Structures are given as structure tokens and as C-alpha cells.
Amino acid sequence: MSQTIRERTEQEEYSRLSPLAAKSAEAKRAREEKECQIRTKFQRDRDRILHSKPFRRLKHKTQVYIAPIGDHFRTRMTHSLEVAQICRTIGRGLRLNEDLIEAIALGHDVGHTPFGHVGEETLASIVGHFEHNEQSVRIFTVLTGNGKGMNLTEEVLDGILHHTGEGIPKTLEGQIVKIGDRIAYLCHDYDDALRAELLKIEDLPPVVKKVLGNTTSEMISTMVTDMIYSSMNSSYIRLSEEVAQAMDEFRHFMFERVYLSDTLKEERKKGKLIVEIL
């Protein structure tokens, strides 16, 4: 039989992608499978996640606002899609594996509880330990496929597990998602806060305006561009010192004025109570 489309794609990766990129042909699964003629392992992982029930359930899970009025506030699903797009752009700029990036980005938050992080914290206080990234891996390895999971590649599972916390993903693609996730949620939560009239543009710290910009579009563009040029030909993904400091200031501002604000305190109480009752 002549060369399959998958084999051609795998071959092209070695000539087209950076030497530092993860290669589909080298990806490992816990259980061996018959290869697809069309799709690489990472492409199949992405499709398995996208078509899964856990991913579809993300549309009912909110980010910050438990019961927002209107259709334009973000959910875990829209967040995951935004993370995927931001991170693919970065990956393309660095000639890394976009299929691996997309799979990690789409699957990174499926383990989240309802009601945002207050749901996660409440469940952890009840059962003793709960981390949404660990639950995401648990879903893909045990809680689907009649106990067999989806048999995703080690590279995808590693990126999902280490997208948050102190651990560093072993692939550059996973490292992109780790930072890209933060870029996405800070910017879209800021946008949602403006829509909810919790904030005004004038409230932004001066250093954030100066370095990152005033609008979500400007902020995303600044951080994505900086991340690409700061990480070029590097063995790890990073932001420049100036942009990283501005991002930290932006994050501190969002926690103080939005995530932990008195305005959302009642919503957090409601979410906590519902999880405790369940």
C-alpha cells in the first residue's frame, strides 16, 4: 500500500516543525491501537475530546458568574475554545505541534466542578482532596469508556495534568497551554467584568494599561506576541520580564476587584451551599 495521509503528515512534521516540537509519530499510549490512515495520534486525541460528553458538559459550567444574565458571559466551554485558539497561534509562531496544543487546551478543564473555583474548594474540603486538573486526567483515563478511559497519549495527559500548579509540562506544547490558559481567563474575565459593570477601563492599574493595553484584544495580542518572541529557539516557554510583571499585576488586580470581590461573595456562598447539599 502507498504512503497513508497520516504517514505523510508525520513525515512533514519532521521537516516543517521545530526540532523542539513534539512529533506525532513518537507519541505513546497506554494501550497500543491500530493507526488511523488519515489522522495522527494527537489529531485523534483532539477529536476524542471534542466529541466527548465531558467536553459537552462544559457549556453548563460557568467561569466566574454563577448565573449570569445574558448569553455573552463565558463558560468553561467558551474558555477552552479561547485557550485553544490563543495557544495555537503561539504554537504556530514557534513551529510547534498545533494538534497536541489543541488537544491539551480542549481537555484541560473538563474536571472542573460547577460554580467555578468555589465549587472545587468546597468539594476539596468535603472529600479531603480535589484538584480539577487531576480530575480531568481521571475522566480521560478511568471515568469514560466503561472504565477504560479514552486511551489518550501520554503527552496530552501530561499537558492536562500540569496546566496548573507547580509542575512543568514535559512538552513545549504543554507549557504554552499553561501560560495561554492564564492569558485567556484574565482577559475574558476582565471583559465579562466590564459587561457586568463590576469594572471600568479606568480602573486598570497604570502599568497594565501601559504594557498590555486597555482592551482584551490589545492585551491578548501583546502577550501572545511577547511570548512568541521571548520563547523563540528556547527550550522552555516564557514571557519577557516586563510583560510577565504586568501580567502578575493584572492577575492581582483581577483577584482583588473581581474574583474575591464583595459583589460576588453572595454568588460564591450560593455555590458553596449547593455543593455541600449535593
Where are these regions (language model features)?
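Short, conserved acidic/polar surface loops in the N-terminal third of protein domains
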Residues: 61, 112-119
